[in-house]
């Protein structure tokens, strides 16, 4: 079991959704407060903790201990790590286990893990008995700053990422920054892409701060907590104004139209983590914006330079097995992008840049210039 955590004063970020508002509690050691917070939210509740095998080794026992100390009965559901669980089969396994555990509508599902576990457990909670509340306990940087906030849940289809799902807001998010100490460098760096995204899409001052301080975020301490809290405030603000992604929330998809296609082309495997796909996608979005004359080449280069300095891939050729079927084929990538949730009447919607710190929604983008741009990028030497 992981050594006891050192604590820091928690930071609370409010997701203002009226009677469905909830707190994101950020800090080192806040996992220990899970039980008392759940008991205060829902006296007499029973819980089921959904996690994966890797997270369970480090954080399942401390989670169960916190719940037990508050007198909260719980059961555990452990799935395989990674996108392999974010499938029909994974959803069936978790749903049937929740039914077997007799989780009722007034109980709570607790998602203890990264983005996959949060999406999977949240979707299972959304459909169980037509809706059971859930708590997010994100254990990856990506999940703490992005997927645990805002209520998007779901699974992948063989035809594309996140094509099946529901909006189902958590009732609480516990983001313990100490749990990130157990991530591999590659996992942490992949999550950092989502942190950088908030600066690129809407906060140039934050992006400038990241350029100067990203190495301190990797080390931990106050810089890490500041980056996570700033990211969560940015997302919480957007979600509170546009919960169902009818407008502004689409900006959060910066880098994702390209990125999701690349994830699908690599079979949702560890050849390309989600955050790595976002980093490449964000770079491509900046470069495509420059090609369209929306930003200068210097701005596009600035975005790419920072992502490289943060240890992230930025080129298609950076993907393992780049020459394998589907990845080096512009038409195949276009077909995958055509499955994107933002496609309308066959035309693509992209999040593009007018400046570093100012993203816009570009609707009805014709496929031809995108295809030509991809062919240009695919032709670059490794």
UniProtKB/Swiss-Prot annotation:
* Highest rank taxon of the organism: Bacteria
Q: Which residues bind Zn(2+)?
A: 194, 256, 274
Provide one Gene Ontology biological process annotation.
amino acid biosynthetic process
- Report a single Gene Ontology molecular function: 3-dehydroquinate synthase activity
A GO cellular component annotation in the UniProt record: cytoplasm
Which family does the similarity line name? Belongs to the sugar phosphate cyclases superfamily. Dehydroquinate synthase family.
* Name listed for the protein in its UniProt record: 3-dehydroquinate synthase
């Amino acid at each position: 079991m992981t050594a006891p955590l050192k604590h820091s004063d928690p930071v609370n970020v409010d997701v203002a959704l009226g009677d469905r508002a909830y707190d994101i509690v950020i800090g080192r050691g806040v996992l220990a407060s899970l039980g008392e917070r759940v008991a205060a939210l829902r006296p007499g509740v029973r819980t089921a903790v959904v996690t994966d095998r890797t997270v369970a080794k480090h954080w399942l026992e401390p989670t169960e201990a916190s719940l037990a100390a508050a007198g909260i009965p719980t059961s555990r559901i452990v799935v395989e790590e990674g996108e392999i669980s974010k499938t029909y089969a994974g959803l069936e396994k978790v749903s049937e286990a929740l039914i077997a555990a007799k989780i009722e509508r007034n109980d709570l599902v607790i998602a203890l893990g990264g983005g996959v576990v949060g999406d999977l457990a949240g979707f299972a909670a959304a459909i169980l008995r037509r809706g059971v509340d859930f708590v997010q306990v994100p254990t990856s940087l990506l999940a703490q700053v992005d997927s645990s906030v805002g209520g998007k849940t779901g699974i992948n289809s063989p035809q594309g990422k996140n094509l099946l799902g529901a909006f189902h807001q958590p009732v609480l998010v516990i983001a313990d920054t100490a749990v990130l100490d157990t991530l591999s460098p590659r996992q942490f760096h992949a999550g950092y892409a989502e942190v950088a995204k908030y600066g690129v899409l809407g906060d140039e001052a934050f992006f400038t701060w990241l350029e100067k301080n990203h190495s301190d975020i990797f080390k931990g301490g106050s810089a890490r907590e500041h980056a996570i809290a700033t990211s969560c405030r940015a997302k919480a603000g957007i979600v509170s104004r546009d919960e169902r992604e009818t407008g502004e929330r689409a900006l959060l998809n910066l880098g994702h139209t390209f990125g999701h296609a690349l994830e699908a082309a690599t079979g949702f495997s560890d050849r390309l983590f989600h955050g790595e796909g976002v980093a490449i996608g964000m770079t491509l979005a900046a470069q495509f914006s420059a090609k369209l004359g929306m930003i200068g080449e210097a701005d596009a280069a600035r975005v790419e330079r920072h992502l490289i300095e943060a240890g992230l891939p930025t080129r298609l050729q950076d993907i393992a097995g780049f020459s394998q079927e589907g990845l080096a084929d512009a038409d195949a990538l276009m077909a995958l992008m055509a499955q994107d949730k933002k496609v309308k009447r066959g035309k693509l919607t992209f999040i593009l840049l007018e400046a570093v710190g100012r993203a816009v929604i570009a609707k009805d983008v014709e496929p031809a210039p995108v295809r030509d741009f991809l062919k240009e990028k695919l032709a670059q030497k490794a």
